[in-house]
Amino acid sequence: MVKIISSENFDSFIASGLVLVDFFAEWCGPCRMLTPILENLAAELPHVTIGKINIDENSKPAETYEVSSIPTLILFKDGNEVARVVGLKDKEFLTNLINKHA
């Protein structure tokens, strides 16, 4: 299951393990297309935690990580950014990215 993140719990959410965060906005078409892909990944890859943060409602993490385009996906390992991709990516691409850092 993909979890919804807020500015308040962002740091604790990414603090440990492998975590993929989707920076999105409700009005973003590619962001909406990414949602079912992330839901599938969450079900198939139990070694990664997946979360989404709405940048319109929670701007601080987007500013901190200099997110200027959406969707932006950032992969964190124990709180540190290890990979970043911008734009709509398919399931195979994201699976390979996650497994590369597992």
Swiss-Prot record:
Annotated GO MF terms: protein-disulfide reductase activity
GO biological process terms held by the UniProt record: cell redox homeostasis
InterPro entries in UniProt: Thioredoxin, Thioredoxin-like_sf, Thioredoxin_CS, Thioredoxin_domain
GO CC terms, sorted: cytosol
Gene3D superfamilies recorded: Glutaredoxin
Pfam family name, one: Thioredoxin
Role description: Participates in various redox reactions through the reversible oxidation of its active center dithiol to a disulfide and catalyzes dithiol-disulfide exchange reactions.
Family: Belongs to the thioredoxin family.
The name this protein goes by in its record: Thioredoxin
UniProt organism field: Chlamydia pneumoniae
Chain's gene name: trxA
